[in-house]
Amino acid sequence: RAGLGALELPYLACADFGRLPLAASSMDLLWSNLALHWHPQPHRVMREWARVLRADGLLMFSAFGPDTFAELRAAYVKAGLVPTVLPFVDLHDYGDMMVEAGFADPVMDMEKLNITYSSSDELLADVRSFGGNPFVERKAGLTGRAAFGALKRALDEQKAADGRISLSVEVVY
């Protein structure tokens, strides 16, 4: 076959990061975008990534850092609620995990983004779009109207002079 049809398709795997269905030293490149922070044991993932990468392989990943959603955490506390935001890992801790897993001289960086919203409803809808709640010990049942209203009021109190609510996102690379 000629043209694009002659290209091999990439191997895609859907699996637990910590138990990849791949042979040791079988990958030239591992790419993970904004997913690592969902795994409860990122140190285990780093060991697994080191196992499947070839000696000269490249690991590229991004994950949310600990300053992500700081304003939302503060609003939860102000509303008298227990925050249901993941405890994101610091970039230095990721670097340490990489060294412990056998990676040589990892290069880490981070970037802080500031997203603004016109309303607390818009902000909360965006946060919900990031996925579910992985906390095993979270409160059973739904958040009541009064508690949800208190959270929205606490977010609305954070509005800047332009009437917008900020939400910080720290991306670790």
Q: What is each PLM-predicted segment?
A:
Residues 1-23, 29, 43-47:
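Class I SAM-dependent methyltransferase SAM/SAH-binding core
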Residues 5, 40, 54, 103:
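Short conserved AdoMet
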Residues 13, 58, 78-79:
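Conserved catalytic core of the tyrosine transesterase superfamily
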Residues 28-43, 63:
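A short SAM/SAH-binding and catalytic strip from SAM-dependent methyltransferases
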Residues 43-58:
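A short glycine-rich, Lys/Arg-flanked "PGG" loop and its adjoining helix->strand segment in the class I
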Residues 59-60, 105:
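A short hydrophobic/small-residue beta-strand
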Residues 66-85, 92-111, 128-129:
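Short, glycine-/aromatic-enriched active-site segment of Class I SAM-dependent methyltransferases
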Residues 104-173:
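Conserved Class I S-adenosyl-L-methionine
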